[in-house]
A protein has these predicted regions:
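Conserved ABC ATPase signature
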Residues: 105-109
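Conserved catalytic motifs of ABC-family nucleotide-binding domains
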Residues: 126
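Conserved ABC ATPase "signature" region
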Residues: 74, 78-101
């Protein structure tokens, strides 16, 4: 069990099932047994409601190369039915060091910048549970510290954070 407001780490080697568990949480993979409840919501029987309380940062970097960073976040917001949240988007961009990249094309960003956008996408709907699958893979030390500071702040504000990693640092 992961308690509400907890910072929980899934530590294990490659192939241990960390990403598979996250895929089950997000409804991308159907568990072969048991149940997964997120804030009391069954991820199997009520995927939409469960997804509304989850912000998942995937391990793989995926993006629409034809959108800017801001357009990407607005599009993601629309997916959640949120049409006007530019103030929150601006706050996310500032906290992730992306303000100066807001109008840049996604295809023009470095890998580390794209990873920051993945984090921003997971946060646009202000989910109470944040799941990060190897969020600092391939990013520099400065970004890593900046990201942890921001995630730490969100945790102190009451969000539950679940993190997967290979290493203790």
């Amino acid at each position: 069990d992961v308690e509400e407001g907890e910072f929980f780490g899934l530590l294990g080697p490659n192939g241990a099932g960390k990403t598979t568990l996250i895929s089950c949480l997000g409804g991308l993979t159907t568990p072969t047994g048991g149940r997964i409840l997120v804030r009391g919501i069954d991820t199997r029987t009520d995927r939409r409601a469960a997804s509304l309380v989850l912000g998942i940062v995937p391990q793989e970097i995926t993006f629409d190369p034809f959108l800017t960073v801001r357009e990407t976040l607005r599009f993601q917001s629309g997916y959640w039915g949120i049409l006007r949240n530019d103030d929150w988007i601006d706050e996310i961009l500032a906290n992730l060091g992306l303000t100066d990249k807001a109008d840049a094309s996604m295809r023009a960003l470095s890998g580390g910048m794209k990873r920051r956008v993945l984090v921003a996408q997971a946060l646009v709907h202000k989910p109470p549970v944040i799941v990060l699958d190897e969020p600092t893979a391939g990013v520099d030390v400065e970004l890593r510290e900046h990201l942890w500071d921001f995630i730490g702040r969100l945790h102190r504000e009451g969000r539950t954070v679940i993190l997967t990693t290979h290493y203790l640092e």
